[in-house]
Amino acid sequence: MSILEVKDLKKSFGKTEVLKGVSFTLEEGEVLSIIGSSGSGKTTILRCINQLETADSGYINVANEVFFDGENKDKKEDPKEKRRKQLLVGLVFQNFNLFPQYNVLENVTLAAKLQAKELPDYKENKAKINEEIDRKAKDILGKVGLLEKLENYPCELSGGQQQRVSIARALVLEPKILFFDEPTSALDPELTGEILKVIKSLAEEKVTMVIVTHEMSFAKAVSSKVIFMDNGVIEEEGTPEEVFDNPKSHRTKEFISKFED
């Protein structure tokens, strides 16, 4: 079974129909890039999957857990159960969303330590559990090249470093799928490369990812599959070679040609 299944997802804001019946699947270890013009519905897909927005209708399944079923959308879900499901996915935002009052290590471990408090043996093993979270966080920070910045605060970091902290924060929770919402859009061009390098290394480790991006060459290099969104629908879907080198849709050709000039 696919690790992510989205069926006929629809979402409107007021009278504006943003998603008009989006369906796709993703297998474990795959990297999906979602491309398209601003306003085409890319970010709304991510927000609906991550339960930051409630879809109007459709179906979302993550790791064999029903995240949304339009036929039962009015049914109240237990808050603890909803939180448990949300931890199956990680979302890296455009604008970092780090806590300025906490240092790098604290930012990375805060959510994991709050989650750990729900463990039945937390009180008896608090020190050991928190120590293990710190160890895991340091290991991940080493992978993203920030081990020497553990005690630094966000204001002391470059934009690229802050984004790498936010990636580490998501990874420490061990999500089944990691989502990126235009992770380089808030960065200067010279800092973009360091983030793309981290994402590429995650792809090589077979981390399952969904990436909304405007970086076409990167999407082509790192993706298992690519979706081109246009006006709330999937205009084209396929391998990077199919979508970028041999697009079937005139609209896809038109969009990609703007990045080749």
Label each PLM-derived region with a short phrase:
Residues 153-157, 161:
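Conserved ABC ATPase signature
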Residues 178-181:
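Catalytic Walker B motif of ABC-type/P-loop ATPase nucleotide-binding domains
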Residues 172-176:
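A short, proline-enriched helix->beta-strand linker immediately N-terminal to the Walker B motif
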Residues 50:
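Helix-to-loop junction immediately C-terminal to a conserved catalytic motif
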Residues 237-238:
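ABC ATPase "signature
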